[in-house]
Amino acid sequence: MNTRRWREFSRHVLLALLFIPLHACTPADDPPISLTQAYFFTESLKQIEAGGRQLQAPDLDEAGLKAALAMLDQGLRLAFQVERDGLDRLDLRLGKNYQRYFIEGVENYRLGIEAGDETQQQEGLRLLARWAEFWSQEGEAIQAKLQPD
């Protein structure tokens, strides 16, 4: 093979090698949400659920109340870091429902407890019930999309 043909052949091989990794990274192969965002989302659900369960304890004392509220606060901090567009890639309704029902529900409930405002607590519980309705139907499918293959 002469030098000119060798260079041309080498150039084609190099171009092909460049396109193989690009093809491997097509959007179809990308996860719908980053690992960090998946962590923020799932951990916010866990923290808030744990705080909610602790608030339901029949023998809740002042220390237990403070610990439960701290879990709710930590869950909300994580929830505020979740990007809506990532959630929408998992399910078109997820971002809106997460914000409107889950986050606002927890905020209302949390603030109602702190202020001793039963009406605000009830509003929070009403919103959380709407979230629970959505999550009970779609949660399993959404969580399956978050699991790495």
Which residue ranges define each predicted feature?
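Bacterial N-terminal signal peptides that target proteins for export
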Residues: N2-V13
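Intrinsic disorder/low-complexity segments enriched in polar/small residues
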Residues: R7-F9, R84, Q122
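C-terminal amphipathic alpha-helix
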Residues: D29-A68, E107-D149
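Heptad-repeat alpha-helical coiled-coil/4-helix-bundle sensor or tether segments in soluble regions
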Residues: K96-E107
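Short, solvent-exposed, charged loop/turn and helix-capping segments
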Residues: L69-N97, Q143-D149
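Sec-dependent N-terminal signal peptides
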Residues: V13-I20
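C-terminal motif of bacterial Sec signal peptides marking the signal peptidase cleavage site
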Residues: L22-A24
